[in-house]
């Protein structure tokens, strides 16, 4: 979205005022309306599609394969494609790296939940396609991954768990599936405008923001990584430490409501 100098000044003053006035009438902690559809890709173990009110859209597919975890200890892999961006574009590589770090960290996905036997485990592939995005897409992607993983079903093991002394591959039931029992982390993005923090900034809010903040949430608490991110190329400034505390407190207060909403799909 391209705003004139006068529009930027008016919008910035509105967002930086006390209380802040957002163009769409949202309170500082409120998210844009979204639609989420799950389990719609028949060839995947789990899937989700999320559409935001501004037309941003993201699809996530979850697939799995059986690996020897003594040979391959990375049991989760995230790949991100963003329409209109090269695979080696900075924004794609940054988001891919962030999501891999969040999901593979100690507070991320518990790899023991993927273990089949003493020798074999499931490896989960998370494929993300951002069809359109009008603002920073990391929160939208995070919500889509959360919904897809929570709708994932894996084949039911019927062979023995102890297979270290017996050379046999895991055997699965022909029809029965087991729901993947994990608690995926979430990633929130906030905009810093003056002395105010705004959750889920829209495109026009991002254009006038002084800075951005990415905060991760897992298992009922804030976790690493926490990092700043530039939401535009022309208005980036440093921010004071008390704004970081304000952003952390906002996520800590409202993240449980987001988790409950996503779990009730």
Curated annotation (Swiss-Prot):
A further note on this protein reads: Present with 7110 molecules/cell in log phase SD medium.
Keywords recorded for this protein, A-Z: Cytoplasm, Exosome, Nucleus, RNA-binding, rRNA processing
The GO terms describing molecular function are: mRNA 3'-UTR AU-rich region binding
Q: Name one GO biological process term.
A: RNA processing
| Family in the record | Belongs to the RNase PH family.
Return the InterPro entries for the record. Answer: Exosome_comp_Rrp42_subfam, PNPase/RNase_PH_dom_sf, Ribosomal_Su5_D2-typ_SF
Q: Which organism is it from?
A: Saccharomyces cerevisiae (strain ATCC 204508 / S288c)
Q: Carries keyword Coiled coil? A: no
For this entry, the protein name equals Exosome complex component RRP42
Gene Ontology CC annotation, any one? nucleolus
Q: What does this protein do?
A: Non-catalytic component of the RNA exosome complex which has 3'->5' exoribonuclease activity and participates in a multitude of cellular RNA processing and degradation events. In the nucleus, the RNA exosome complex is involved in proper maturation of stable RNA species such as rRNA, snRNA and snoRNA, in the elimination of RNA processing by-products and non-coding 'pervasive' transcripts, such as antisense RNA species and cryptic unstable transcripts (CUTs), and of mRNAs with processing defects, thereby limiting or excluding their export to the cytoplasm.
Q: Which proteins does it associate with, and in what oligomeric form?
A: Component of the RNA exosome complex. Specifically part of the catalytically inactive RNA exosome core complex (Exo-9) which may associate with the catalytic subunits RRP6 and DIS3 in cytoplasmic- and nuclear-specific RNA exosome complex forms. Exo-9 is formed by a hexameric base ring of RNase PH domain-containing subunits and a cap ring consisting of CSL4, RRP4 and RRP40.
Give the location in the cell. Answer: Cytoplasm; Nucleus, Nucleolus
- Please give the PANTHER family that the UniProt record associates with this protein: EXOSOME COMPLEX COMPONENT RRP42, EXOSOME COMPLEX EXONUCLEASE RIBOSOMAL RNA PROCESSING PROTEIN
């Amino acid at each position: 979205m391209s705003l004139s100098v006068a529009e930027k000044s008016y919008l910035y003053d509105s967002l930086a005022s006390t209380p802040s006035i957002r163009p769409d009438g949202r309170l500082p902690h409120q998210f844009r309306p979204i639609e989420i559809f799950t389990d719609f890709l028949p060839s995947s173990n789990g899937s989700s599609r999320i559409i935001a009110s501004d037309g941003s859209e993201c699809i996530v597919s979850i697939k799995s394969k059986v690996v020897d975890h003594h040979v391959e200890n990375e049991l989760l892999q995230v790949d991100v494609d963003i329409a209109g961006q090269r695979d080696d574009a900075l924004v794609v590589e940054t988001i891919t790296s962030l999501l891999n770090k969040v999901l593979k960290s100690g507070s991320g996905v518990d790899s023991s939940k993927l273990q089949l036997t003493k020798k074999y485990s499931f490896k989960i592939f998370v494929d993300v396609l951002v069809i359109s995005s009008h603002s920073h897409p990391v929160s939208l992607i995070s919500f889509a991954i959360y919904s897809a993983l929570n709708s994932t079903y894996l084949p039911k093991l019927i062979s023995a768990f102890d297979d270290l002394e017996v050379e046999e591959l895991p055997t699965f039931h022909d029809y029965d599936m087991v729901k993947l029992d994990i608690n995926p982390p979430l990633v929130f993005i906030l905009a810093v405008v003056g002395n105010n923090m705004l959750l889920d900034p829209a495109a026009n809010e991002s254009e006038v923001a002084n800075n951005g903040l990415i905060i991760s949430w897992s298992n009922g608490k804030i976790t690493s990584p926490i990092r700043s991110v530039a939401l535009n190329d022309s208005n980036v400034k440093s921010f004071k430490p008390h704004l970081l505390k304000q952003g952390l407190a906002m996520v800590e207060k409202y993240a449980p409501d987001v988790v409950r909403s996503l779990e009730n799909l």
